[in-house]
C-alpha cells in the first residue's frame, strides 16, 4: 500500500465521501489513489476555491470538509481558507503535496515552507515523511510527559465543579454521523435553568447544524445570542467580549440575574 492509498483508506474509515481539489504535479499520486478509492471529487478553479468550498460543505452538512492541493504555491493558496476555518471553528482537513524528501529545504521547484505558514492558521499541522512513525502515539506520549510537570489538580477541581453544576453529556452510538439537532435540543431543554442563554461563535452560528439548533432552541424557551465569551467559573462570573451594540443590548437585558450559560462550541 502506498502513502496515497493509505490516505484514501483513512478518509474512507472516517466516512469521508466528498473532496474538493485542484491537481498539480506533486499531488498526482494522491489523485490516482482517489480515483481508485471511488470517492467523489469536485474540481475547483483554484486552490483558494477548494478551501472555501470545503468550508461551505462543512457549514451546510455538519460534516468535515476535505480539500487537496499540490505543493508550493498550490498549498500556500489555501492559507486564507485555513485562517477563515480556524477563526470560525469550521472542521476542515487539508492534504497537500510536497517535493521529494531529499529536496525539502533546498528551494526546489514548487517548494514552500507550508508547515511554517500553516502553523498560525491551523490547530494541527505536520509533515509525514515516514509511514513507520506512529504520529498519534507520539503525540499522546508527548502530552503525557508534559502533564507530569504540570500542577493540574486545581483545573480538574474547577472542571468537576462545573460539570456538577451543568450536568450534560450527549452520547449516542452513531459513529461519525452528525449530531441529531432535535435530540440535542431535547436533552438541553430537560436540563436548562429557566434563564439560560445559548451562546455560539460567529462561524458556528453559520453552520447548518447550529442554525437548526438555534432555530429550534427559541421554541424551547432558550435565549440565543452570538458572541465570543470566556466563562470564569467563580460563582458564575462572566467575562464577555461583544462584537456589536445589538449583542451588548441583548446581554444587558438578559444578564441582570447572571444566568447560567450553555455554550455551543
From Swiss-Prot:
Binds 1 Mg(2+) ion per subunit. GO terms for molecular function: lyase activity; thiamine pyrophosphate binding. Residues 204-247 are annotated as: Thiamine pyrophosphate binding. The keyword Lyase applies. The keyword Lyase applies. Keywords: Lyase, Thiamine pyrophosphate. SUPFAM superfamilies: Thiamin diphosphate-binding fold (THDP-binding) (SSF52518). Thiamine diphosphate binds at residue 47. Its cofactor is Mg(2+); thiamine diphosphate. Truncated acetolactase synthase; no longer catalytically active. Belongs to the TPP enzyme family. PANTHER family: ACETOLACTATE SYNTHASE, THIAMINE PYROPHOSPHATE ENZYMES. This is Putative uncharacterized protein HI_0737. It comes from Haemophilus influenzae (strain ATCC 51907 / DSM 11121 / KW20 / Rd).
